[in-house]
Amino acid sequence: MKIDLTGRTAVITGGSRGLGEAMAKALAESGARIALVARDVKRLEVVRDAIRKSGGTAEFFAGDVTREDDVARVAGEVKQRMGAAQILINNAGINIRKNLVDYTLAEFQSVMDASLTSTFLMCRAFVPGMKGTGYGRVINMSSIMGHVSLPGRTAYSSAKTALLGLTRALALELAAEAITVNCISPGPFGTEMNTAVMNNPETNAQFLAAVPAGRWGDVGEVGAMACYLCSEMAGFVTGTDILIDGGWTAR
């Protein structure tokens, strides 16, 4: 069954590259109008132009989603230029790989803010516009690091685990409004965040050995799941977390 998101406006943070870019393109192919949000204007222009070249509709809104004033400004600009948003995908995030005792407070907080605080701010800004419409979709991007962890991921695992709790709580708050709230937790994907691991034969082999499927994930697989969760078919799916990890966490 073809997923049709025609007439829906989707706001995607971290939409300038990686999984955010993949989800933006997938939703655009399904007919959604895409509002890309990130700090890198040059990359935003590239993704916007690629979507338009493929026949989709996309605009970009440069801003720092960890800043309350930037989120308020972006929300106003999206509403003015594209109307109310029915879909919100919170994909922004960073990772600083250090052991706990080596973090500065600023470094730890920056990782938490990029994933968790930004999600709070974006939901607070955009969810009210979904209420009373009979349809709304929020997808928060967690990670398998919210379920398991590795050395040097203290801040990242903390942020991604917290997102699971936020998602469940918000899903309960919004269920009666026909607004679904779910997480996607990707495993190892071939994005820029993992370039160093992939380009090192030793670490690449170690990662692949941990994945029962024996390969890196394709970003299109996350895009497809995002489309499903945004569709009418997923109206009864809320408060849950979808692991896309090639069996990593099933071991």
Tell what function each PLM region has.
Residues 120, 135, 179, 215-244, ...:
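C-terminal substrate-recognition "lid" of short-chain dehydrogenase/reductases
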Residues 123, 159, 167:
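Active-site helix of classical SDR
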